[in-house]
């Protein structure tokens, strides 16, 4: 599948994350049928909408940012997709003309803390825009927690800077996008700290379940591991943690307390 695309500068990294694009493409091509109505929520460059439109009867592609919307509109026109309706608007408030057979919503980030995936999907569900047998891509997100020796005193993504892992990695939440989910969350977690740490931190990872055949881990532009330092010296042994944050908020909403 060859497409001609123009994108804002900040979208180049998304388009060149081929691992991320490939797994979404594979899931979309597997899930979408020829009679389907598809919503692409937060369409960005429009690339996922165009992949869906190769098979779907109709695709509604919505983008909040007016600058990005202009690029998506041009991309869809240049590539000759007459079955895509491009919309400038907020997916959480826009009134769609019909219900969706398939929803694509790549509004993802680590632990769903910053991006509005949960808020948008809650709104679509609550306002009755989904058919009973709707297929959602991604279907779920699973997040894990692990203790680390933090390398910095502020929140950072554990990419170029690797933090020493000092506990097992455990699942602390599973979010199913077929149902409404809370915006404010709080978790009590107990982990075994394998060695004493000068600056204990927690590392969060998110694994994206696109459908029953496709699972995405971390890629260069999808859910990089996030480290939250506690800036405390903690001795080896059992560690009780309370982790809370606001989904679709910002990193400042994260609160971590030792029990």
From Swiss-Prot:
Q: Name one GO molecular function term.
A: protein-arginine N-methyltransferase activity
Q: Name one Pfam family in it.
A: PrmA
Annotated S-S bridges? none
> Entry's InterPro entries?
Arg_MeTrfase, SAM-dependent_MTases_sf, UCP006607_RNA_methylase-rel
Record's family? Answer: To M.thermoautotrophicum MTH738.
Q: What is this protein called?
A: Uncharacterized protein MJ1452
The organism named in the record is Methanocaldococcus jannaschii (strain ATCC 43067 / DSM 2661 / JAL-1 / JCM 10045 / NBRC 100440) (Methanococcus jannaschii)
Organism classification:
Archaea, Methanobacteriati, Methanobacteriota, Methanomada group, Methanococci
